[in-house]
Amino acid sequence: MKSVIFGLQWGDEGKGKITTYFSKDYDYVVRYSGGSNAGHTVMYEDFKVVHHLLPSIHAKYEVGAIISNGVVLDIEQIVLEIEDYISRVGRIPNLCISNLAHVVLPQHKLFDGLLESVKENNAIGTTKKGIGPAYADKVHRFGLRLADFEVDFKEKWNFISHLYKKLYRIEVEGYDGLLKAYEKIKRYILPHVEIIDLIEQNNVLFESTQGVLLDLDIGTYPYVTGANCNTTGIQNGVGYPVKVEKYMGVFKAYLTRVGNGPFPTEAFEEEGENLRRKGNEFGATTGRPRRCGWLDIPLMKYAIKVSGATELIMTKSDILNGFDKIPVCVEYEINEERVSDIKSVVELEKAKPVYEYFKGWESHNSQSFLDFVNFLEKQLKVKITYISIGPKVDQIVKL
């Protein structure tokens, strides 16, 4: 069995918890895109783990973790995560890392921050973790891979340092730190063909980062991440034409966004602050407050279409417990015309939400909540199979 769990919104949908919950049914969880800009928080009964690069494996089961070639790896960060995992869980994770994964360098992080600062009002609002610059150098064909540490690391480091000095006037230290970090993760690194063998021969759960609407190609460009975090990124992200059977799309019962970009259903002032406070909507990676708003049906339809979602999982419905009424955007008004489907996310800049209001609920057992779920299924034409009813990994209900 090959399945994928991915976000249908702008990230922060609760994919980490959902992936962890289902990971016990698989041999490996595979991260295929992104970098340390991801923040997947998993809460157990007695401790919490935040994954930035480590796949969201269940700490209480023997599940393997694979970081594939599509990930850009901050090797100093992964060392910290492994150490933190060991201290909390009490054992070393069964981790395999592709030797073809590219490395995030100190130059990338510094350049990321500088680029945001000079953009001023056009800034994207990145995490400044160097993800975009690392992918850019990969495309420019002077990126550094894990495999290069065993061949000509010093020569490549000097070349990259020379380029950044000449092109951007950026000079940083980092050679010794990278070497030390590499030595600590060397035991986990495998030739990529062996990664493919593991994927071929086992039941695998692919774990996406961010969300479909942040995908480099079909997201709300330019306010996107540097990677293909849609399900279409799996093939490139593992370097193998894998066949996926289940596409599990995760969405929150409301909507959030970090950074800049269009957000038609954004709630402001007291309304937005109430959602942010109740949902604890602060970034796991940066701590930044998330922009909060209401569920957006036209945008969900778009995300489902481009991702191929075969089933849906709703999270954080419990955050809306006790609300008198729940707004849901069912249509947009664009250029004085009503539309229920969008052809392109470019249209979002002009979109004004048209809301339908639903009676609030006290719990997931309330009839008003079940009516809400039935409405969503009719609108989206995809079955909602599970709902998350709390922050802990086992607080999930099958419908």
Curated annotation (Swiss-Prot):
Pathway: Purine metabolism; AMP biosynthesis via de novo pathway; AMP from IMP: step 1/2. The active site is at 12 (proton acceptor), 40 (proton donor). The gene is purA. PANTHER family: ADENYLOSUCCINATE SYNTHETASE. Homodimer. GTP binds at residues 11-17, 39-41, 290, 316-318, 388-390. Keywords: Cytoplasm, GTP-binding, Ligase, Magnesium, Metal-binding, Nucleotide-binding, Purine biosynthesis. Belongs to the adenylosuccinate synthetase family. This is Adenylosuccinate synthetase. GO terms for molecular function: adenylosuccinate synthase activity; GTP binding; magnesium ion binding. Substrate binds at residues 284-290. It comes from Thermosipho melanesiensis (strain DSM 12029 / CIP 104789 / BI429). One of its GO terms (cellular component) is cytoplasm. The keyword Metal-binding applies. Binds 1 Mg(2+) ion per subunit.
